[in-house]
């Protein structure tokens, strides 16, 4: 039951369109992809692109649908929730990573970079994986070791060679580019102020591992990129990877902000990550809604001792409490979206992520209990 939701017109339109796509395309394929650890079907990516789901945060002047303001954030939240109701692995997470890069570009990209990349992000011509976490540095982003050092390209162009290892790079096999945070200042005492953000093009790779090479210089030196898949219990379909880069060259024009972006990568990245926390909460609401619907349906169709499971008071209490948490999480997310539209809500975005994800654990467990181990 979704009574009491407070959305605006733009969000309602997004909800109706995405809900139809979720029910017709995503939900029927979700279990098969999860059980067999297959790839996200291309028809899902192309379908979401056709309806404009990847352009919700891309400014209209660059081929997207964003006019700024509250509607943009609300539309993203309701779309993310609805896609996650169908599948977390092949639905809800797909639009998050392009949106993170979009916000980083809007924040710090040059006009040429915006013209080059934002239209491609809006249409899914370019799909993105985020390469920030490293084996020894997760939340401690300021300590990362992957380096980007100035180096000329095969035709003498200015650029950088990237060396090091990134991990938990979701969707990195299928992605066309990595949004990669690297250390451009060797003075580690500068911590996060020595980091810069790059758009790193790559070929599309196999879901179960990939290895690419590139000729970097006239001396025949070769750049290498190798992706090792990390098996996961959930989030199947997008696949996560550990990526090793050795002398992988990128042009200087792919440094977000170009020369003026040196040392500002952490701030550009956080512009995307803050809204990513809100989207994580929205995904959790979608998972809760799916769990509730499955439990509700089962309880009303399963007969035990002559009665439907739903007729027993304990089941009714469980369903009632689940509904309370779902609606609380949903409305919390809406309010944070409104704050973020005003340039506020950084702390609240972390709060809603922490609260709703914890609630989703409980709701999913209660749904399993109602199923009685079925």
Question: Where are the predicted features?
Answer:
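Long, acidic (Asp/Glu-rich), low-complexity accessory segments flanking structured domains
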Residues: 246-267
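Flexible, small-/acidic-enriched active-site or ligand-binding loops
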Residues: 206-248
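Short Gly/Pro-enriched turn/cap motifs at secondary-structure boundaries
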Residues: 136-139, 168-171, 188-189, 231-239
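Active-site-adjacent elements of ketosynthase-type condensing enzymes
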Residues: 136-145, 210-215
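A structural signal for short hydrophobic beta-strand segments in well-ordered beta-sheet cores
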Residues: 146-150
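A short, Trp-centered hydrophobic/proline-enriched beta-strand micro-motif
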Residues: 124-132
């Amino acid at each position: 039951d979704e009574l009491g939701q407070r959305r605006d017109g733009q969000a309602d339109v997004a909800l109706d369109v995405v809900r139809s796509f979720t029910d017709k395309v995503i939900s029927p394929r979700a279990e098969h992809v999860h059980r067999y650890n297959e790839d996200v079907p291309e028809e899902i990516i192309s379908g979401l692109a056709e309806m404009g789901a990847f352009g919700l945060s891309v400014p209209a002047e660059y081929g997207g649908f964003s006019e700024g303001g509250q509607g943009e954030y609300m539309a993203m939240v309701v779309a993310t929730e609805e896609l996650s109701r169908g599948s977390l692995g092949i639905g809800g997470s797909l639009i998050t990573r392009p949106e993170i890069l979009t916000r980083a570009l809007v924040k710090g990209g040059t006009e040429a970079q915006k013209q080059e990349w934002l239209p491609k992000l809006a249409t899914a011509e370019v799909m993105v994986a985020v390469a920030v976490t490293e084996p020894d540095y997760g939340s401690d982003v300021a300590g990362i070791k992957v380096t980007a050092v100035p180096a000329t390209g095969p035709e003498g162009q200015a650029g950088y060679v990237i060396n090091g290892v990134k991990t938990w790079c979701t969707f990195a096999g299928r992605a066309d580019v990595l949004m990669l945070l690297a250390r451009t200042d060797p003075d580690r005492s500068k911590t996060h102020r020595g980091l810069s953000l790059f758009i790193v093009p790559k070929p599309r790779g196999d879901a179960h591992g990939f290895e690419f090479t590139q000729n970097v210089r006239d001396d025949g030196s070769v750049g290498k990129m190798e992706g090792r898949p990390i098996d996961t219990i959930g989030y199947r379909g997008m696949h996560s990877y550990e990526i090793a880069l050795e002398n992988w060259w990128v042009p200087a024009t792919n440094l977000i902000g170009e020369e003026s972006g040196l040392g500002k990568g952490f701030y550009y990245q956080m512009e995307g990550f803050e809204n990513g926390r809100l989207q994580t909460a929205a995904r959790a609401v979608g998972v809760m809604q799916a769990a509730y619907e499955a439990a509700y349906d089962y309880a009303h169709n399963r007969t035990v001792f002559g009665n439907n499971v739903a007729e027993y008071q304990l089941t009714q209490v469980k369903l009632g409490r689940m509904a309370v948490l779902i609606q609380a999480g949903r409305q919390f997310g809406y309010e944070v979206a409104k704050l973020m539209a005003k340039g506020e809500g950084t702390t609240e975005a972390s709060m809603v992520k922490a609260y709703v994800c914890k609630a989703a654990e409980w709701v999913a467990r209660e749904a399993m209990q109602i199923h009685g181990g079925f």
